[in-house]
A protein has these predicted regions:
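Short strand-connecting beta-turns/loops that link adjacent beta-strands
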Residues: 59-60, 82, 137
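Short, surface-exposed charged micro-motifs
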Residues: 66, 86, 131-132
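Conserved short histidine dyad/triad with adjacent acidic residue
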Residues: 66-83, 126
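Glycine- and acidic-residue-biased ligand/ion/polar-headgroup-sensing regions
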Residues: 71, 82-102
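Short beta-strand His + acidic residue motifs that chelate non-heme Fe in jelly-roll/DSBH
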Residues: 76-78, 96-98, 122-124, 130-135, ...
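Double-stranded beta-helix
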Residues: 104-116, 129-184
C-alpha cells in the first residue's frame, strides 16, 4: 500500500492493510463530520475502501472502525468463527445479509441513518455467514468486533475461489441489489 495522508492530524497509516487504513496517533479519538469527509475523499481518490480505526492497533481487545465502503467493492459471504460483528450506518445505505450453510439468503437489512421505520444497526453473531456492501456510491459505517485481529484465522468464506462461485456470488449480489433498491 502506498503512503496516503488522511488530511487530518492525529492519524498514522497502516501500510500493511489491504484497504486504506489509519490508526490513531493518541487516545482519546474524536470522530467528526470533517473526518468522515476526509475518509470518503480518500476512498474516492484511491478507488479503495478506507477506514479509520478507533482502537490503538491490531492487538486491541475491542476493534472499532469507521469504514467508508464503496459499492464497487463487495466481498463474498464469510463468517467469523469466534467473533460477533456489529454494523451501525452513519452515511449512505449499507446492505447486510446473512446466509445458511448452503449459501441461501436467510435475512437482509438495508441500514440507513435517520430513516423512518428503517434499521440503522445490526449485530451478526459469531459463526454466521454474512456479507455487507454499499447500495449507494459509498456507505460509511461503524464496525465493532472483538480483537485481536488475525488475518490467518479471522474468517472463513462460504465458497472457495472459482469462476463458478464468483458467478454465483455476482448473481446473488445483483439479486440483493435489485430487491432492495426497489423496496427502499
Amino acid at each position: 500500500m502506498k503512503k496516503t495522508e488522511l488530511g487530518m492530524d492525529g492519524w498514522i497509516q497502516d501500510l500493511s492493510a489491504k484497504s486504506l487504513s489509519w490508526f490513531p496517533d493518541k487516545l482519546p479519538v474524536e470522530i467528526s463530520e470533517e473526518l468522515i469527509d476526509c475518509l470518503e475523499e480518500k476512498s474516492m481518490e484511491s478507488k479503495l475502501n478506507a477506514r479509520v480505526c478507533l482502537h490503538k492497533g491490531p492487538d486491541s481487545a475491542l476493534q472499532e472502525m469507521i469504514i467508508c465502503q464503496r459499492n464497487d467493492q463487495a466481498h463474498p459471504p464469510k463468517r467469523h468463527p469466534l467473533r460477533d460483528k456489529t454494523f451501525l450506518v452513519l452515511r449512505g445505505t449499507l446492505l447486510v445479509s446473512i446466509f445458511n450453510e448452503l449459501g441461501e439468503v436467510i435475512k437482509t437489512w438495508c441500514l440507513q441513518p435517520e430513516s423512518k421505520n428503517k434499521v440503522f444497526c445490526v449485530r451478526v453473531p459469531a459463526g454466521v455467514f454474512h456479507c455487507d456492501f454499499a447500495l449507494t456510491g459509498t456507505a460509511v459505517h461503524l464496525e465493532t468486533t472483538l480483537g485481536p485481529f488475525s488475518p490467518k484465522n479471522d474468517r472463513e468464506y462460504l465458497w472457495q475461489d472459482s469462476p463458478e462461485n464468483l458467478n454465483r456470488w455476482n448473481a446473488i449480489r445483483n439479486n440483493l441489489v435489485l430487491n432492495n433498491v426497489k423496496n427502499d
